[in-house]
Design a protein with these regions (language model features):
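Conserved beta-strand-loop surface patch within small alpha/beta domains used
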Residues: 2-125, 134-231, 236
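Membrane-anchoring helices that localize proteins to membranes
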Residues: 234-246
Length: 246
């Protein structure tokens, strides 16, 4: 079992002061799988559209794998049990598959953090998801390390999805230990915020590596730099690269 450190993506309010609220009614949420009876584990409500978004991202990514941030709110019911409402998701624009792990690149981390802070007002980072085809859902040692170092708040969770089998598995914090959760609640809500990798690029939160490294762009940039005409601002550089790419 993994120890839980402080998380750099945690809400500064902290889980101990999570607002109190009623959980979604039975008419709006359906249990998928078997819920863990332990009151110390968070209960997870995920919007149906979020799950469909993740499943679509995983299918598009194929063997490369997919990942991203889960966005929403951390709450407590009137009896004190923690629960999370996940009604937002950001697809990572770039991942690396390393053995049995899915890794976010440093550029992807930066883009995800920027999107979470600028485009998801009223929501916080509830955790992350990643998808690997053809393997039973599990957390690799590297992914456990990611959960420890980046998603260590008491209410932050991890979702692993296998698009081949359709299996989902969730992990969350029980005190200082990272444990597998039981089922989750599929939640019907119209208010979702979903951000695909292409939207990160459109909003200039992420620039594909090939745009900066393709030979034509490199040569044009080098020539402009020597003439002293290559722009210094990031926005102007992006525009210049696009012009040279045609």
């Amino acid at each position: 079992m993994a120890d839980r450190p402080d998380s750099p993506l945690a809400n500064p309010v902290g889980a101990g002061m999570a607002p109190s609220a009623e959980e979604p009614s039975a008419a709006r949420a359906r249990l998928i799988g078997q819920e863990a009876p332990d009151e110390g584990l968070p209960r997870v409500y995920v919007a149906r559209r979020v799950m469909e978004f993740i499943e679509g991202a995983a299918r598009r990514a194929g063997a490369d794998g997919a990942a991203g941030f889960l966005m929403g709110r951390a709450l407590r019911n009137p009896r004190g049990r923690r629960f999370v409402l996940i009604d937002g998701c950001i697809e990572a624009p770039e991942v690396e598959s390393a053995g049995r792990s899915v890794k976010l690149t440093p550029r992807a981390w930066k883009a995800l953090r920027s999107a979470a802070s600028s485009a998801f007002e009223g929501r916080e980072v509830i955790g992350w998801f990643h998808a690997r085809p053809g393997e039973p859902p599990h957390l690799s040692p590297y992914e456990t390390f990611v959960q420890q170092t980046h998603f260590g708040a008491a209410w932050q969770v991890a979702l692993v999805y296998d698009p081949d089998s359709g299996q989902h598995a969730w992990w969350g914090w029980h005190g200082e230990a990272l444990e597998r959760l039981g089922g989750f609640w599929l939640w019907e809500t119209p208010s979702c915020r979903l951000m695909a990798a292409t939207e990160l690029q459109r909003l200039a939160l992420f620039e594909p590596a090939q745009a900066a490294t393709s030979p034509g762009v490199r040569e044009a940039a080098a020539a402009a730099w020597q003439r002293g005409t290559w722009p210094t601002s990031r926005a102007a550089q992006v525009a210049a690269r696009r012009r040279h790419q045609g």
